[in-house]
Amino acid sequence: MPIKVPFRAMWLLEISHLTKSYARPGGNGGRHRVVDIAAFALAPGAQVALRGESGTGKTTFLNLLAGIVAADGGSIRLDGRELTALGEAGRDRLRAGTIGYIFQGFNLLQGHTVLENVELGMAFGRGVDRGRAAALLQRVGLADKHRHYPRQLSAGQQQRVAVARALANQPKLVLADEPTGNLDRRNAREALDLIREVCRESGAALLLVSHDERVLAAFEDMRDFAGLNRALSTTAS
């Protein structure tokens, strides 16, 4: 039977029959399907965690939602717009105005200060607002580090910068890819609490992927990515 998404007057994110494949290594001409998702939906302001081990397509899935990579087929409807109908420039604009992304491994620019890294989260959206960037650093407890460079910060502090940058463009959806993977237990707990709190405060929905059961246990709405992604149980041609 086809998987149906329950009716909701307005979803922030709606996915239908989303697929992505890559060429198999070795040049044999075959394709390896990484993502094959029949249906998924996320309400405004929702906080959902996806459980999945490394190599299961979680990062590719988030990159599809962010428009960083193009889908092979299917539909991604984000904030009322069809993402898959847009070219690369259109996807970039939609991402800049709608999505915040907390990358695995922080992904901070080492040649820029902490404040500049946060401002870069605004650069392709509504324009740089230094006052907002400073306020975000205040919110994540790094106001006194605004002139520092990422290499001068601890791992926990770098993750806080990444959180501030993700919120810089006032997103409606925050994507978080293994956001605690490089942190010790204490910093992981603090980072997770911070991410969830700032999303609640701003009204942004949160979609987080992780394999850490301690992280996943914090979410009332936790789903198994292996059950969602049919590519893990089928062989693509």
Predicted feature descriptions by range:
Residues 12-13, 19-218, 225:
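ABC family nucleotide-binding domain
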Residues 219-236:
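H-loop (His-switch) and adjacent beta-strand-loop-beta switch element
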Residues 1-21, 232-237:
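ABC-family P-loop ATPase nucleotide-binding domain
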